[in-house]
């Protein structure tokens, strides 16, 4: 198992522009760092579905059924479109910190889970790229898959948390600037 190669690929994938990182930035700018981190926790929880699917061989079944895979891609695209339209039409609000509102936190967390599960970039990574890092010829690859899945979740949460903190800090600086 090439752990450092996997970590490098995982970090690059996580930093690559896409809906997950864009929504972490959006939540952090509009609602604060805490909201971005709650959303990031949801995204990382959604990764459990991908790791489980790969570990149990469900991904092989999905890839062998073009209809099922296409339906999943369309569901993901439709959900991302829905979120984009909803964000575009949303009333512009001033920057505020998520103040322990459990309903808002729960909604952001659930949105993160669903968004990650339906994200085509993450699906393709776990279907096509992830298995390349599993040692060939081992009798039971499941523990190795679970370990790599855990590593992926941890690095993703760390990166999303840093992105949330930076986006929040930039938003606060811009809001304090009288010229903005």
Listing of model-derived features with the role each one plays in the protein:
Residues 64-92, 156-163, 171-180:
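Selective transmembrane alpha-helices of multi-pass membrane proteins
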């Amino acid at each position: 198992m090439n752990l450092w190669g996997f970590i490098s690929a995982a970090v690059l994938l996580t930093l690559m522009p896409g809906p997950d990182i864009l929504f972490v930035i959006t939540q952090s700018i509009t609602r604060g760092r805490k909201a971005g981190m709650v959303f990031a926790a949801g995204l990382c929880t959604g990764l459990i579905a991908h790791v489980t699917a790969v570990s149990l061989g469900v991904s092989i079944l999905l890839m062998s059924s073009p209809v099922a895979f296409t339906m999943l891609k369309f569901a993901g695209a439709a959900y991302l479109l829905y979120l984009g339209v909803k964000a575009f039409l949303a009333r512009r609000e001033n920057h505020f910190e998520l103040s322990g509102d459990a309903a808002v936190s729960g909604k952001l967390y659930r949105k993160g889970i669903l968004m990650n599960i339906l994200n085509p970039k993450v699906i393709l990574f776990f279907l096509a790229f992830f298995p390349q890092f599993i040692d060939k010829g081992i009798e039971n690859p499941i523990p190795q898959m679970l370990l790599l899945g855990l590593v992926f979740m941890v690095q993703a949460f760390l990166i999303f948390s840093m992105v949330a903190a930076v986006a929040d800090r930039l938003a606060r600086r811009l809001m304090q600037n009288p010229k903005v």
